[in-house]
Amino acid sequence: MSSVFTRGSVDSMPETHINLKSTIPSIKIKTEGVEKLLRNINPYKASGPDNIPNRILKQCAKQLAPSLAIIFQSSIDTGVLPKYISSIYKKGDKHSAEYYRPISLTSVPCKLLEYIICRNMMNHLEKHNILTSLNHGFRSGYSCETQLAVTIHDMLQSFDRKKQLDIAILDFSKAFDTVPHDRLLHKLNNYGIRGPLHAWLTTFLT
């Protein structure tokens, strides 16, 4: 699985103009917030590796929320995250590990925890204007449509000014699989993602 667990030395990291002194605030899990997320679960979606039906999680939200809140908080504070990993064949030689992708099967409660962490991280990044306005992926209020609107605007502007316009469309092979985790974690540290949350993300990526 070398294509997935790419290693890269942080010694050769390019200089970055972003090195926040401000650290992301500690995430405090609230029972009410967990209960709300449980109530919003789609009961018709498949359950996770724990085989707990979504309908049970949704209908028992009030009873489950206090315990899950404690587990979520403990996971963040200790950096411990249980995993169940399965290899999924994509294409090519079935006898070569290169053509299999390891998938971490996540339980529904764990997905809720991931959502909470992601929301806190995005709030931190948005607050400090770390994300460029040109990044339209995986952001609230941004989408393929907003990216297309910007592209069309730039095209029409170039046409009006009678300037040359070149468009390069790139598709990186296994882009997500080959991100060096050491470099990613180093970058997150520069962005103020430190302490227990950084340790949790390290476990998540391992």
Question: What is the predicted role of each segment?
Answer:
Residues M1-F5, E98-K127, Q147-V150, S173:
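Conserved pre-motif C helix in the palm subdomain of viral-like polymerases
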Residues M1-Y99, S104, L112, G192:
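Surface-exposed loop/turn segments and immediately adjacent short secondary-structure elements
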Residues Y44-I52, H95-L105, T146-H186:
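Conserved catalytic palm subdomain of right-hand nucleotidyl-transferase polymerases, strongest
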Residues I52-C60, N135-S140, I169-A175:
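Conserved short loop/turn motifs at secondary-structure junctions
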Residues R55, S67, I116, V150, ...:
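Amphipathic alpha-helical interaction/coupling elements
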Residues K127-L134:
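A short alpha-helix capping/helix-loop junction motif
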Residues F172-T206:
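Conserved polymerase palm-domain catalytic core
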